[in-house]
């Protein structure tokens, strides 16, 4: 995947527009190449007798003999970064045994620039480059030192109560990588205050849960019952610990 995608990042060839993908975003050549790599691997599984379906941000839903398990594919999460040559984008894969976010039983987030790999299997913990991990320990457990936000400019205004109390602010432009880093304690809180696709969260929210973190919408409601498709959207507030999540809710004025 990295050999196919990285040479196209920040190039005219990689930015070449193709069509509008199933998720509603403009597909570029870099997206197509990345998706082709993933689908080639999945087609090999199907040829060996595995039965499943695939839901891709670019190609939509395809059946390979069974409705479930369902493989979610975002071949380039952070595609605007990739298009512009900004080295912060990744591959997101999730496997579900049902229609909702709570049905996610395996997840992969791959940083396509560094090769760092984050994986999780439901009830078997989260791993970074093959090693089990939990969030970094901090002495000031309830203070938001490093806040990460979803990348639209309006997010800063909507999340102003968090921004004002955070020590520093980061905006990466990749949902999957932002949540993965939060799961390990790299960010104290990640907030998407405007509705985003639940599809984009699936793999990294499993990482977060398996590492002991907490995720809700901005009202403090659980995300598990939400359908995992290309249409369903939700706000997101997540943190590596319950204390940090509770502090973020408090700053947003959400009673618990």
Model features per residue range: what roles?
Residues 67-123:
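DPxDG-like acidic metal-binding loop motif
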Residues 5, 46, 121, 136-256:
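An extended, acidic
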Residues 1-76, 249:
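N-terminal subdomain of lithium-sensitive/metallo-dependent phosphomonoesterases centered on the IMPase/IPPase/PAP
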Residues 31, 78-79, 182, 208:
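Buried hydrophobic positions in well-ordered alpha/beta secondary-structure cores of metabolic enzymes
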Residues 100, 125-128, 243-247:
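Short helix-loop capping/hinge motifs at secondary-structure junctions, enriched
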Residues 29, 130-138:
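Surface-exposed beta-loop interaction hotspot
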Residues 61-65, 83-85, 99-102, 110-111, ...:
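Solvent-exposed alpha-helices and their adjacent loops that cap or buttress functional pockets
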